[in-house]
Amino acid sequence: MATRLIIGLGNPGPKYQWTRHNAGFMVLDHLSRVMGTSVAKKSFSGLYGEGSWHGDRLLLLKPQTFMNLSGRSAAEALRFHKLTLSDLIVIHDDLDIPFGRVKLKEGGGHGGHNGLRSLMQELGGGGFVRIRIGVGRPLRGDAADYVLANFSSAEMAGLPALLDGVVDLLGELVRNGLPRTMSLYNNKDFLPAA
């Protein structure tokens, strides 16, 4: 039974609950419901839970440090559980992917994402799997304001299908590994056809 740490990135508090930047938190909350566990224990400078799923032990973590300090929480959890970067899956929002689409990758830079920047600084590199949740770019205005704004009503209507799709993707990743999951899910549109 493999142990994996899955971190959903976001900002704590009700003010940020439905913002685009909290896509990682939303996926982790949905995954925990599917697994029949909760992410409510205060540990590792975050909210933490664990359970078994598809034969693996999954450790779920939502850092409560605010986005730009997420790496501290991740480093604490990895050290405590004696895990390496290859055991880590990070779920985060991505401006360069349209809403409804998801991309997976292993390694790479932070692409200007402050949560990833913090993780890479604290962990000494970026050699972990990322599940990048597309939130799209604003037509006009500041990207920082955009990711800290709530999803639009049209996006909110598509969130359940997107969250279900990402949990299916995670199940495939846990069962069958990254190459197969990438071939099945990379850039897949999870939104229902209009």
Swiss-Prot record:
Q: Where in the cell is it found?
A: Cytoplasm
Naming one, the record's GO cellular component terms include: cytoplasm
Keywords for this protein: Cytoplasm, Hydrolase, RNA-binding, tRNA-binding
Q: Where does tRNA bind?
A: 16, 66, 68, 114
Which residues participate directly in catalysis? 21 (proton acceptor)
Gene Ontology MF terms: peptidyl-tRNA hydrolase activity; tRNA binding
Q: Does the keyword RNA-binding apply?
A: yes
Q: Which residue numbers mark the site Discriminates between blocked and unblocked aminoacyl-tRNA?
A: 11
Question: Does this entry carry the keyword Cytoplasm?
Answer: yes
Taxonomically, the superkingdom here is Bacteria
Q: Where is this site: Stabilizes the basic form of H active site to accept a proton?
A: 93
Q: Could you provide one GO biological process annotation from this protein's UniProt record?
A: protein quality control for misfolded or incompletely synthesized proteins
Q: Which SUPFAM superfamilies match?
A: Peptidyl-tRNA hydrolase-like
Which E.C. number(s) belong to this protein?
Answer: 3.1.1.29
Matches recorded under PROSITE patterns: PEPT_TRNA_HYDROL_1, PEPT_TRNA_HYDROL_2
Q: Which reaction does it catalyse?
A: an N-acyl-L-alpha-aminoacyl-tRNA + H2O = an N-acyl-L-amino acid + a tRNA + H(+)
Please name one Pfam family that this protein belongs to.
Answer: Pept_tRNA_hydro
Q: Which HAMAP family does this entry report, sorted A to Z?
A: Pept_tRNA_hydro_bact
This chain's function reads:
Hydrolyzes ribosome-free peptidyl-tRNAs (with 1 or more amino acids incorporated), which drop off the ribosome during protein synthesis, or as a result of ribosome stalling.
Self-association and partners = Monomer.
Protein's recorded name: Peptidyl-tRNA hydrolase
